[in-house]
Amino acid sequence: MFLQLFSDCSMRILVYGFGPYREFHDNITARIVRSLPSQAGLKKIIFPVRFQRRQFIDALNRHRPDFVLGLGQSSRKRIEVESRAKNYRRASKSKPWRPILKGKPKSLPTSLPIDPGRWAGISTDAGDYVCNYSMFVLLEEIDRRQLRTSFGFIHIPYDFDHRKACRIVDRILRKFALLRVSEQLEPAFTRLRA
């Protein structure tokens, strides 16, 4: 199990998901986060679905993780690893697009390898809601402060089988933890500055 790997290498991991929103009263990401065993070195957070920069920055400051994995619910057909966050948001279809942070790049890459394995696809579009917002805010903060934190984000279909989703998240976490331990997974800021 990936948690044993984390405890063996003193790695600090932050895994986050989101609570209910709109018509979704049961967010699959909250269930997955709650399913992860509690252990030293692993912090689990379920954020409210809000465009609130402070909640994400506070979590980064409080836990100082080596690796952050965000989980978001989607209407897609398969699990997808996000490769970048875009610097725009839109709270609803009736509201105009606007930048998350003015004067910042149009997009920022995550620090995960391009190939997540056969159990997930790659996405270049994290949407325009709070998932993308959290990604951009955290990646920009990691870059601005040149933190040694690796970052990744996974979108999970809302109707995906919960047990299967937990197994896939576990595999992805193990894969990325092994890469980080072997120093093949760079901190996010080194990729942002490449």
Q: Model features per residue range: what roles?
A:
Residues 2-129, 138-151, 157, 162-177, ...:
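N-terminal catalytic or cofactor-binding beta/alpha core of small enzyme domains
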Residues 134:
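Active-site Tyr-X1-5-Lys
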